[in-house]
Structures are given as C-alpha cells and as structure tokens.
C-alpha cells in the first residue's frame, strides 16, 4: 500500500493506493507544529474509520509546501512506520522537462498536478488548482512543464476583505449566488468572489491558449480543474473541461511508481 500525502498551507490530503487504484482519501487541517507521533496518530485514526491500517503502508510519498511538515512525515515514514520515503523536490525524477526559469522554485503541488494531467489527460494541458492559492499551469504538446500564474485563493481574499472592512462579512461560498446582479450584501460578496474568480480563471486559460497556439501547441489540449475549492468554483468556469479533485494524489502515485522502479 502506498500512502500519498499532499501537504498544503490549509489542508493536508492523504491517499491510500493499491497499485494505481486510489482506494480511499482523507482531508485534515494542516498543523505545522504537530510531532511525528501526533501526525501518525491522526493518520491512523482516519485510516481506521475506513477499516484500514496505517501499518499496511509499504511506502510514503509527499508533496509539500510546508517545509516543517515534510520533515515530520519523513520521520513518521522512516522511524515509526519504517518504510521508504519520497519527497517531491528538485532531485526527484519527474519524467518530464521543467522549463521554469528556476526549476527548484516551482511549488511541488504544481509539478505533481502537471505530471498527473499529462499521464491521465495527455499533453498539452492546462491545470487550474483552487486552494489556499489559485494556480493555473500549462503543459506543452511536448509534455514539458511550462509554468503558469498564481493568485490568492478564494478564502485568502475573503479573509483580507473581511479584516480590512467594517461592514463586509465573511460569507459561505458554498452557497450558490442567485444572480450576478445581487440585491443584498452577502450575495453581492458571493457574486464577486464566485463569478469574479471564475472569470479570472477563464481569462487566464484563454490567454494560456493564445500563447500556446502561437507556438502550435494546442492540438488536443485539455483543461483540468483540481484543488479543495475546485467543486465550488469550476462549475462557473466556461473553460474548464474536466473536474478531477484527486489529480494531485494521482500524480504522487505516478511519481512514486517512476522513482521507486528506478531505485531498485
């Protein structure tokens, strides 16, 4: 069993793989200062809820944007579970070219999404990931990671608005805005965030398509949405073709299979 871990700034997603099959997944709050024992206990409890055992893990792979927690999971794998540990980073073989100016500066989650999109949807591809940050990234027709765009996530922007204004509340974005032209303040905020972010993502995707088209890179292009907030926002996006909430976990499994086989 492979334990795949996607550590984000707000949430950590765990995946349990049998071969290429994602058997179960869980989300928990990212808490950077928890000890390996505490993290292990939390993971074990989540596994047990599905009738699974953490001790069945025979390897762990981690994608992390929180460096402190990378070390925590490394310790959990090596010293407690005593299984091989893989961390997505500059030294890992991605099986694809990384054409970022500084390849080591790309967020691990962005690379993992690119790997998964190419594997499951082909190249070229555009990936929109809606989480703590919203990212839109491109894979060209040759299968290379080309880079992308980053903007604040929905709730990061919501927190900024609520904290910097006296009369604009934090609202639940899971509730659908009835119309773009809203007639009360909560719905006006929902309209601005939902339709505004959907429009921003669509605009970026269209610009990506234009730039890739100028290089003859758009034949067969797919546009994929993922991330914890993707179910909220993607249905309002006109450019999104596929919603795959498990894309990052699937990319981790692809990278594990590639790197574990070469380590043997």
From Swiss-Prot:
UniProt remark on cofactor binding: A monovalent cation. Ammonium or potassium.
Organism from which the protein derives: Rubrobacter xylanophilus (strain DSM 9941 / JCM 11954 / NBRC 16129 / PRD-1)
Known cofactor(s): NH4(+); K(+)
A GO molecular function held by the record: ATP binding
A Pfam family per the record: Pan_kinase
HAMAP family to which the protein is assigned, alphabetical: Pantothen_kinase_3
Reactions this protein catalyses: (R)-pantothenate + ATP = (R)-4'-phosphopantothenate + ADP + H(+)
InterPro entries in UniProt: ATPase_NBD, Type_III_PanK
Residues engaged in binding K(+): 129
Phylogenetic classification of the source organism: Bacteria, Bacillati, Actinomycetota, Rubrobacteria, Rubrobacterales
Keyword Amino-acid biosynthesis attributed: no
Gene Ontology CC terms, in alphabetical order: cytoplasm
Family assignment from sequence similarity: Belongs to the type III pantothenate kinase family.
EC number(s) per entry: 2.7.1.33
GO annotation (BP), single: coenzyme A biosynthetic process
Pathway: Cofactor biosynthesis; coenzyme A biosynthesis; CoA from (R)-pantothenate: step 1/5
Keyword Phosphoprotein appears in the UniProt entry: no
Gene3D superfamilies in UniProt: 3.30.420.40
Role, per record: Catalyzes the phosphorylation of pantothenate (Pan), the first step in CoA biosynthesis.
Domain of life, source organism: Bacteria
Residues binding ATP: 6-13, 132
Main subcellular localisation: cytoplasm
Protein name as it appears in the record: Type III pantothenate kinase
Binding site for substrate: 100, 107-110, 185
């Amino acid at each position: 069993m492979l334990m795949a871990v996607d550590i984000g700034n707000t949430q950590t997603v765990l995946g349990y793989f049998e071969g290429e099959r994602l058997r179960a997944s869980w989300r928990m709050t990212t808490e950077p200062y928890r000890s390996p024992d505490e993290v292990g206990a939390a993971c074990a409890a989540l596994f047990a809820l599905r009738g699974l055992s953490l001790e069945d893990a025979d390897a762990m792979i981690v994608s992390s944007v929180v460096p402190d927690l990378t070390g925590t999971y490394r310790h959990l794998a090596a010293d407690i579970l005593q299984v091989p540990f893989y961390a997505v980073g500059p030294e890992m073989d991605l099986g694809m070219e990384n054409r970022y100016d500084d390849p080591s500066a790309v967020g691990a989650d962005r690379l993992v999404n690119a790997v998964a999109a190419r594997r499951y949807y082909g190249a070229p591809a555009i990936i929109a990931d809606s989480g703590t940050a919203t990212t839109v990234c491109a894979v060209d027709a040759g299968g290379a990671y080309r880079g992308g765009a980053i903007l604040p996530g929905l709730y990061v922007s919501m927190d900024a608005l609520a904290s910097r204004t006296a009369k604009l509340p934090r609202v639940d974005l899971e509730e659908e805005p009835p119309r773009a032209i809203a007639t009360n303040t909560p719905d006006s905020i929902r309209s601005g965030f939902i339709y505004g972010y959907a429009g921003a993502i669509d605009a970026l995707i269209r610009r990506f398509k234009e730039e890739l088209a100028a290089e003859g890179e758009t034949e067969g292009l797919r546009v994929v949405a993922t991330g914890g907030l993707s179910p909220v926002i993607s249905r309002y996006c006109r450019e999104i073709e596929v919603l795959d909430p498990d894309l990052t976990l699937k990319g981790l499994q692809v990278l594990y299979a590639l790197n574990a086989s070469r380590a043997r």
